[in-house]
Swiss-Prot record:
Protein name, UniProt field: DNA polymerase III PolC-type
GO molecular function: 3'-5' exonuclease activity; DNA binding; DNA-directed DNA polymerase activity
SMART domains xref list: EXOIII, POLIIIAc
This protein's encoding gene: polC
Transmembrane regions: none
Native source species: Staphylococcus epidermidis (strain ATCC 12228 / FDA PCI 1200)
Record keywords: Cytoplasm, DNA replication, DNA-directed DNA polymerase, Exonuclease, Hydrolase, Nuclease, Nucleotidyltransferase, Transferase
SUPFAM superfamilies hit by this protein: PsbU/PolX domain-like, Ribonuclease H-like
Keyword Cytoplasm: yes
Length: 1442
């Protein structure tokens, strides 16, 4: 007979993983697909053999962790053996090499021979493992010694290895023969082995005693002192060596106990040349463990030992013989007077900055800097953490941002003149130059064509001699060589001739600002002054009139306009192509009503002009609190209103909100730096007047400009610095030296390189990244020594400190909660509470009701929480009025005021009876009843009416704290389909500008970072050890990658403030089409400052609504203690089916909270019969270490029953108060236990004084997390209501379940008879390990369908005439599925079928395809389903159709 257990093998594996406490350490697919297939128990030998099936091999570390955890968990019960089977063995060759050393350890070879064997080379050939040995003696010995044991060891690990063959390696020598023979002679020295085992056991006992103790030594020192002259860089370690000494800093540490009782420490250490794993075992009779415990991440060590190839990780590691902790002097700022950094990027600079702001602040404080600025790219999301870090370290925080400044509109026409475009003469021209700077580079070719009436009428082409050699870059770009320029005329001659040739024609150029820059500079040097001719820029013109184009380069436009372009970047060819393109553009302008040069800018410029402007970097520094709010407005506008590929700040916007903000010139991508490269000094000084300070940065930060030949040489760079300094003097604004830091130390640069390399489109990939570490004062002074000591000190120290002193103390986040105002909220909450209480309990309220209301109202009103309650009440009332129940989450059900204001259905008073007629009540406040719903039915002793049963006995303290001053966190579960309505209703309540979605920040996760690191190393052709890869991964992890929104969180701004008092705003992930804007700050940062409503979506209220619509039954009238409903939690009998028929021992398939395999197993173990026991199970199933290894064992051992174990957090406080503990001590104990903090001596003493049993104390100590009882009660109440429909109105239930909760259907199986469906479910159980996620979802649906079929109901095929788009409908004792249930058929098509059939019947499959857009695959599926009876492939043409 085959017995199908209620739990699947997969669920058993999950239970096992939870029990041995490694669920969070296994890979997700292992956890989801692992299967415990069998446990063989031998009582005679006290041996348990676990048969475990996995989807793929575990890493060797995870394998050891897993097996060790199982052995430790059951060591007191039995000796454990584990046999693995692996589904996917395609890569077993790779893993066999990693497991080889472990499998050797399972044999009975001597330790020395094992060590020798581990060094051998391996070759996998099919299912045969070949081990290459040195000679025949070795081969014969190993073959005899292993005797199949190595094969067995591999097979236990899941390998399909049939044979291990030892073959002589012809490349090896026989040098080790004598040594080998000696090892063989030692093989049978059993006594020595036994002695060793004895010592190991003694050591294990000692280690167990010390395991949880703190280290008793201050500094790690094991073995001999290490000579510093022997230290070698880690990067130089490339092969096995006998003795090596290194030093480095620990970045990861793992200390674990072995089965023998010894410990092993594994350190990952780096000296920033490379990284290495160091290992060491505790020695016999030594205090090594204490020394190991003295080590921690961040400490420097010096270590010495043997470098060997680790056969498990296939990497070089050091087996340490000596280790000592050393003091390493950190980087210091030794300058007497410190600088202030005004340009710094944190991990909030998206995929660019590395450390979080706290690391910078801590470093600056250690260096003695008085202040520090943060200026992330385009965002201010580091501000909250910056404030906290600055307060902690006592440093002045300066808040700022590096933004993208754009002119409101980029002109298309310069120096417009009153000229008719049709009649005007144009000079279309192009220059080729020695570089991009018109101030420092020279024209080498000037070419132009003259255009009139749409025709080219003349040409001009001249080379000019630059008197310098061309760079390779320019030669390759322009195809102009030095030889071509040797005899060319001087530029003065060329420009003089050109000016005369041009006359008064309108200049036309592609990117005219560049070409005109060289012309104007040349004219001025000749004394002509800048050109007075009008100009048209075809680049900006195209961007304006060809908005549908994504590109506007000359190559692209030539193709679009059908113009031939040859030898791009030769002036004459570019000029001719531009001319023909421009001629066609003139016609386009005419069609747009532009006929005059004066009209171009006026008529073609639009509100999106900011998109065409080229952004320049700008630094914005907050000077005071007003400036902070203005910065928040600027940031918000740039992210919401002016976002185009990147957030943009129009100059007009900056001018509008610049009060309280200091504006700096930023980096080499700033407007002023560009002007120094492109304009004369008078223009530079004019631009400088817009700014409040000028930034200059170390020469190393401009190195990429020199590499790209944008700056010619150091002399040119020095001239640029001097011009910037002169501009500051002329504008009377300070010049400050800034570091543009992106990481802390020089060795962190690699992490930034990796992040930038992971972004293919990032322009920074085009050049070498500059040295952008956080510089000390001395470093910065040294960087600017070429300016002279006095000037360097002025810009590095004097000016930065003076500027910092001008900045007031600014606080970016509030220090208290600001809730919305609602007039009369206090009175309304009080009146609502008492009004509804009197409706329920009568005018003469019981004292227990009055006491509870007053206690709560004192806290709620006294702490200003009334408005929070009232908002929640309005939201719930709106949903109820619209016909949707609301489920509460969290602890709000602990509040009786919340119950009386109808925020929650959970009544937290002690269990009690109430008479709805005469209001007689009876309370049970002695702890004898777990839930009022469990009280026996009873007639009112006063009037004889049936009494109502209520009360869950939940203390108010679990909601607002013992003092009642904790900000209430009211989470509400709205119907998933109603949730958007609830969200939008907040706009009605408070106004659209007062509610925002709670923002989140997504950072680079460890697995993502690993991919970035591997990709970078592969692209660079670099091989690194695993330890170094781990270090690089840590460096990239945590950097901001994107933004998002909380699934249900709504932030409410009070009417007397605006959002910019708290945070900027943006769209989630910068998606400009999103329906809601979010807070710019992560909502956790402002959680204590503004009200956050948790308006969540849930299936239960949606299902309840559908059941109500189908049945007409008000769900609030459903009896919670219905006996037949309660019976399904312990068996399926009340459903009219047997366990064998539905393959389950309970009837809870599809019941929320109780339908999973894990909880069904709990139900089987506990057989609950009451509501309070169901609440217990809900609490037990959601807690951590509450059920497994705790309550489960207590129940199995008969120590207590389900009703008395600790299930929910509130149970602890209530139980302890009933036991006699002071309420404050009971509350404190509950808080400690629910947070996994165990019990203090004071708590233990109080509990023992009041005779709390020892098992209760032990249970408290094991708990890591607990579920609130109010939350559990709310969930169970919904579950019982749904279960009621399942028992008494089955077709309504199944229709609602399949419509609301199910998503993947196998309709072909579902329409079959019950036996066939059951057989399919059984078959899928047997193949569960092989099922994918989608198949498992189908199985869940089939379990419900099997139950439905055995209850006498069936599913019809899809009906073209009757099926709805989305809902299952009832017909007789059957359900008709909707179109959406067809695999591969989407929502739009489902709706289209319904709409199409209203126009008339489908005449054929071809007609179905045309009208509804069904694919052939879907039509074939419907055909197989029997949904298209007699429907021909094509319609027959009738004579009447002609």
């Amino acid at each position: 007979m085959v017995i199908i257990l209620a739990m699947t093998n997969r669920e058993k594996f999950k239970v096992l993983a939870d029990q041995i406490k490694i669920s969070n350490q296994l890979e997700q697919d292992i956890l989801e697909q692992g299967e415990l297939t069998r446990i063989d128990v031998s009582n005679k030998n006290r041996t348990w053999t676990f048969q475990i099936s996995l989807p793929h091999f575990l890493s060797h570390e995870d394998y050891l962790l897993f097996t060790h955890a199982i052995e430790e968990e059951f060591k007191e019960i039995a000796t454990v053996a584990i046999d693995f089977s692996i589904k996917d063995t395609n890569n077993q060759d790779e893993f066999a090499l990693k497991y080889f050393g472990h499998c050797i350890d399972q044999t009975r070879l001597s330790p020395k021979v094992k060590g020798q064997l581990k060094q051998k080379k391996l070759i996998m050939s099919g299912n045969v493992l070949k081990v290459l040995v040195s000679n025949d003696i070795e081969r014969n010995h190993f073959d005899k010694a292993c005797n199949g044991s190595l094969v067995k060891a591999f097979r236990q690990c899941g390998f399909e290895i049939d044979k291990v063959v030892f073959e002589t390696d012809s490349t090896n020598h026989d040098d080790d023969l004598a040594s080998l023979e000696a090892h063989i002679q030692q093989e049978d020295e059993q006594s020595a082995r036994e002695a060793t085992e004895k010592l190991e056991k003694m050591k294990a006992e000692k280690a167990k005693q010390q395991d949880n103790n703190e280290s008793t030594v201050e500094k790690c020192q094991i073995g001999k002192p290490i000579q510093i002259e022997n230290i070698k860089p880690i990067e130089s370690i490339i092969e096995e060596e006998f003795k090596v000494a290194i030093e480095g800093v620990i970045f990861d540490i793992n200390l674990k106990e072995l089965k023998s009782g010894r410990h092993i420490v594994e350190l990952k250490v780096t000296d920033y040349t490379d990284s290495l794993v160091l290992k060491m075992f505790t020695r016999k009779n030594k205090d090594d463990l204490d020394h190991f415990k003295a080590l921690s991440v961040g400490k420097w060590v010096r270590a010495q030992g043997r470098i060997e190839e680790d056969t498990f990780v296939r990497d070089l590691v050091m087996m340490m013989s000596d280790i000592e902790e050393i003091k390493k002097t950190p980087k210091q700022d030794k300058a007497e007077d410190k600088r202030v950094e005004f340009h710094l990027h944190t991990s909030m600079s998206q995929m660019d900055g590395i450390p979080n702001i706290s690391a910078y602040v801590e470093q600056a404080a250690k260096w003695g800097h008085q202040a520090l600025a943060v200026t992330d790219h385009n965002v201010v999301q580091a501000f909250p953490d910056a404030h906290n870090a600055a307060e902690k370290h006592g440093i002045k925080m300066i808040y700022g941002m590096e933004g993208m400044l754009v002119d409101d509109g980029v002109p298309i026409a310069y120096k417009p003149t009153d000229r008719n475009l049709k009649d005007a003469t144009y000079v279309v021209f192009d220059v080729e130059t020695t570089g991009l700077s018109n101030q420092y580079d020279k024209i080498i070719e000037l070419a132009a064509v003259k255009v009139h009436n749409g025709e080219i009428i003349d040409k001009f082409e001249r080379f000019s001699n630059p008197h310098e050699r061309l760079s390779e870059t320019i030669i390759n770009l322009t195809h102009i060589t030095d030889d071509m320029l040797t005899d060319a005329p001087e530029i003065e001659e060329v420009l003089t001739e050109f000016k005369e040739w041009v006359g008064d024609a309108i200049f036309v150029a592609h990117n005219a600002s560049f070409d005109m820059g060289f012309i104007d500079t040349g004219y001025e040097r000749l004394g002509f002054g800048p050109s007075t001719n009008g100009v048209i820029d075809t680049l900006e013109l195209s961007r304006t009139i060809n908005t549908e184009y994504g590109k506007h380069g000359l190559n692209f436009l030539a193709k679009k306009y059908g113009v031939e372009l040859t030898q791009h970047h030769r002036a004459i060819y570019d000029t001719e192509a531009t001319a023909y393109i421009f001629i066609k553009m003139v016609q386009q302008m005419k069609e747009l009503g532009v006929n005059n040069h004066l009209e171009i800018n006026k008529k073609l410029t639009n509100e999106d002009a900011y998109k065409r402007a080229r952004p320049s970097h700008v630094t914005l520094i907050v000077q005071n609190q007003e400036g902070l709010k203005n910065l928040f407005k600027i940031v918000s506008a740039s992210l919401v209103k002016y976002y185009y590929r990147t957030p943009r700040i129009p100059r007009s916007l900056l001018n509008e909100y610049r009060e309280g903000i200091l504006i700096g010139t930023a980096c080499d991508e700033g407007e002023l730096f560009t002007a120094v490269m492109q304009k004369d000094q008078s223009e530079v000084e004019k631009i400088a007047k817009f700014y409040d300070f000028i930034e200059v940065q170390p020469p190393a930060l401009y190195q990429d400009l020199m590499d790209r030949e944008l700056i010619r040489d150091n002399e040119t760079l020095t001239q640029i610095y001097k011009r910037l300094i002169d501009a500051g003097k002329s504008a009377n604004i300070p010049v400050i030296a800034t570091g543009n830091a992106h990481y802390l130390y020089e060795h962190d640069a690699i992490a930034r390189k990796i992040l930038i390399a992971s972004q293919p489109g990032n322009p920074l990939n085009r050049s070498t990244l500059p040295e952008a570490h956080f510089r000390t004062t001395d470093e910065m002074l040294d960087d600017f020594h070429f300016l002279g000591e006095e000037k360097a000190y002025e810009i590095v120290v004097t000016n930065t400190n003076e500027l910092a002193n001008k900045i007031e103390k600014v606080v970016p986040i509030k220090d208290k909660l600001f809730t919305p105002r609602m007039d009369g909220a206090n009175e309304e909450i009080r009146e609502l509470s008492y009004s509804n209480a009197k409706k329920l309990y009568g005018e003469d309220l019981p004292q227990i009701v009055i006491d509870r209301l007053e206690k709560e109202l004192d806290s709620i009103i006294g702490n200003g929480f009334s408005v929070i309650y009232l908002i929640s009440q309005r939201l719930v009332k709106k949903s109820l009025d619209d016909g949707y129940l609301v489920g509460s989450r969290g602890s709000v059900g602990s509040s009786f005021v919340a119950t009386m204001t109808e925020i929650t259905e959970v009544n937290p008073l002690p269990p009690h009876y109430i008479c709805s007629h005469c209001k007689t009540s009876e309370f049970f406040d002695d702890g004898s009843v777990g839930s009022g719903f469990d009280l026996p039915d009873k007639k009112c002793p006063t009037c004889g009416n049936e009494l109502i049963k209520e009360g869950q006995d939940i203390p108010f303290e679990t909601f607002l704290g013992f003092k009642g001053d904790k900000v209430p966190d009211i989470d509400l579960n709205f119907s998933g389909e109603y949730q958007p309505n609830a969200h939008n209703y907040t706009k009605v309540l408070f106004g659209e500008d007062k509610v925002f979605r709670a923002g989140t920040i997504g950072t680079v996760a460890e697995k993502t970072a690993f991919g970035f690191v591997k990709g970078y190393l592969n692209d660079q052709g670099i091989h690194k050890r695993g330890a170094e890869i781990d270090r690089l991964v840590k460096g990239c992890t945590g950097v901001k990658r994107t933004t998002g929104q909380h699934p249900g969180g709504i932030i409410v701004v009070p009417d007397y403030m605006d959002i910019y008092d708290f945070t900027p705003i943006q769209f989630p992930a910068d998606d400009q089409s999103a329906a809601w804007m979010t807070t710019h700050f992560d909502f956790h940062s402002i959680h204590d400052n503004v009200l956050k409503l948790d308006i969540l979506g849930h299936d239960d209220p949606t299902m309840i609504r559908m059941l109500q619509d189908l049945s007409g039954i008000d769900p609030k009238t459903i009896p919670v203690d219905d006996k037949e409903t309660m019976q399904i939690f312990s068996g399926p009998e009340s459903l009219g089916v047997t366990e064998d028929e539905i393959l389950c021992k309970t009837g809870t398939f599809g019941v929320p909270e109780f339908g999973t395999g894990f909880v069904r197993q709990m139900l089987e173990d506990t057989k609950p019969t009451t509501f309070s026991e169901l609440v217990q199970i809900s609490g037990l199933s959601h807690g951590t270490d509450v059920w497994l290894g705790n309550a489960q064992e207590l129940i199995r051992q008969g120590i207590c029953d389900l009703s008395s174990v600790i299930g929910c957090r509130d149970d602890i406080m209530v139980y302890l108060m009933y036991a006699g503990l002071e309420p404050s001590m009971a509350f404190k104990t509950m808080e400690f236990v629910r947070k996994g903090r165990g019990l203090t001596d004071e708590m233990v003493e109080a509990m023992k004084e009041n005779n709390v049993p020892d098992w209760y104390l032990d249970s408290c100590r094991k708990i890591k997390y607990m579920f609130p009882k109010a939350h559990a009660a709310a969930y169970v109440l919904m579950a019982v209501r749904i279960a009621y429909f399942k028992v008494h109105h089955p077709l309504y239930y199944y229709a609602a379940y399949f419509t609301i909760r199910a998503s993947d259907f196998d309709l072909i199986t579902m329409i079959k008879d019950k036996t066939s469906i059951r057989n399919t479910v059984k078959d899928m159980y047997s193949r569960y390990m092989d099922l994918g996620k989608k198949e498992k979802d189908v199985l869940t649906v089939l379990e419900i369908m099997n139950e439905m079929a055995h209850r006498g109901f069936r599913l019809q095929p899809i009906s073209l005439e009757k099926s709805q788009a989305f809902d299952f409908i009832i017909e007789g004792d059957t359900l008709i599925p909707p179109f959406i249930s067809v695999p591969g058929l989407g929502e739009n098509v489902a709706q289209r079928i319904v709409e199409a059939r209203e126009e008339g019947p489908f005449l054929s499959k071809e007609d179905l395809n045309k009208k509804a857009g069904l694919s052939q695959k879907v039509i074939d599926y419907l055909d197989e389903l029997g949904s298209l009876p007699d429907l021909p492939d094509k319609a027959q043409l009738s004579i009447f159709d002609m």
